[in-house]
């Protein structure tokens, strides 16, 4: 009888001891947290607000792929010089990879070549620097996108009329590739082409206002979202406003498209662009030196088709 009582007391106690040991040791928990990959993200302009959806895609990819992002935004007037300094600093700090949105392809090529040769991989977004050693470029086919915008503007600008192209890029980028392609299409179709460039530190709105006082364009074309937003803000509500076309799919751009201030836009999935860019940077950090990525699809969207399901995904992305 005593033995039976003893067993009844000891067995539960042993069970509790085993349970306690299992809880304290927790074999399912790694003894040390897995180290995150460090990826530095360098924007090309001081105002990065138009990259907000792409940034959400980057952050989601970082969460999914066990990476940590450091966002760096140039603050000075010489964007290329500041990006060079940031590239060198981040490479020296030991970051695992750099995601670069170049402000000037030619000015940054040597720096990219030097740091990639020294072992820090670089992936670019929007502007291709693979010839300088970057592992990959994520973005649309800029020439095709520019041609599409040029063809769209042909519909609103009669033969012989003037089309003004907004030129705010400080150097050679994917944005200037778009502009060059659009200009070639317009000139081949018998349209006059002018360019609007800010001078002496003026903003784009002032430059466009100045341009409109001396020119009477039938259409204006912008080649990135920031320029398109500013042009739309200036032209909104003006009775004599030229037709406005451009690249970009921000919430502000969508609002102006709905109001018919913007006639047509070339839009791509910005969330996907950001996600794929970080994914490529993770691949590069893992040792894949170079790899080919298909260009991102873009779509021409007008007010009348902006609420079609596929276009809604571009203009009003649902993020996790």
What are these regions (language model features)?
Residues 138-162, 249-253, 269-286:
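Hydrophobic alpha-helical segments within soluble ligand-binding/sensing domains
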Residues 70-92, 194-214, 228-230:
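Structural motif
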Residues 107-144, 250-258:
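Flexible loop/hinge segments that line or gate small-molecule binding clefts
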Residues 8-24:
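Hydrophobic membrane-insertion alpha-helices, especially the h-region
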Residues 8, 272, 276-320:
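Hinge/cleft segment of the Venus flytrap/periplasmic-binding protein
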Residues 94-102, 121-125, 163-167, 193-194, ...:
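Periplasmic-binding protein-like
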Residues 39-56, 61, 70-81, 105:
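Extracytoplasmic "Venus flytrap"
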Residues 99-116, 199-254:
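Hydrophobic alpha-helical
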């Amino acid at each position: 009888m005593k033995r039976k009582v003893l067993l009844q007391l000891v067995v539960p106690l042993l069970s509790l001891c085993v349970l306690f040991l299992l809880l304290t040791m927790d074999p399912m928990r790694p003894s040390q947290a897995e180290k995150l990959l460090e990826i530095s993200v360098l924007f090309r302009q001081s105002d990065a607000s138009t990259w907000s959806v792409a940034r959400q895609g980057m952050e989601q990819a970082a969460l999914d792929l066990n990476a940590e992002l450091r966002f760096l935004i140039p603050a000075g007037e010489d964007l290329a010089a500041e990006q060079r300094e940031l590239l060198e600093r981040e490479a020296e700090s030991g970051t695992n990879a750099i995601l670069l949105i170049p402000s000037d392809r030619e000015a940054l090529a040597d720096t990219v070549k030097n740091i990639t040769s020294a072992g820090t991989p670089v992936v670019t977004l929007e502007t291709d620097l693979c010839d300088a050693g970057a592992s990959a470029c994520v973005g649309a086919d800029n020439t095709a996108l520019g041609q599409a915008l040029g063809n769209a503007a042909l519909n609103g600008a009669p033969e012989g009329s003037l089309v003004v192209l907004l030129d705010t890029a400080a150097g050679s980028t994917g944005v200037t590739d778009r502009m060059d392609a659009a200009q070639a299409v317009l000139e081949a179709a018998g349209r006059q082409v002018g360019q609007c460039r800010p001078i002496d530190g003026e903003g784009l709105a002032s430059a466009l206002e100045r341009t409109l006082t001396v020119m009477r364009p039938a259409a204006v074309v912008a080649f990135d979202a920031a320029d398109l937003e500013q042009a739309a803000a200036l032209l909104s509500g003006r009775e004599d406003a030229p037709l406005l076309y451009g690249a970009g799919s921000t919430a502000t751009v969508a609002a102006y498209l709905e109001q018919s201030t913007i006639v047509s836009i070339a839009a791509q999935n910005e969330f996907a662009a950001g996600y794929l860019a970080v994914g490529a940077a993770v691949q590069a950090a893992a040792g894949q030196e170079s790899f080919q990525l298909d260009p991102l699809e873009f779509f021409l969207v007008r007010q009348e088709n902006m609420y079609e399901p596929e276009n809604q995904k571009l203009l009003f992305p649902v993020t996790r």
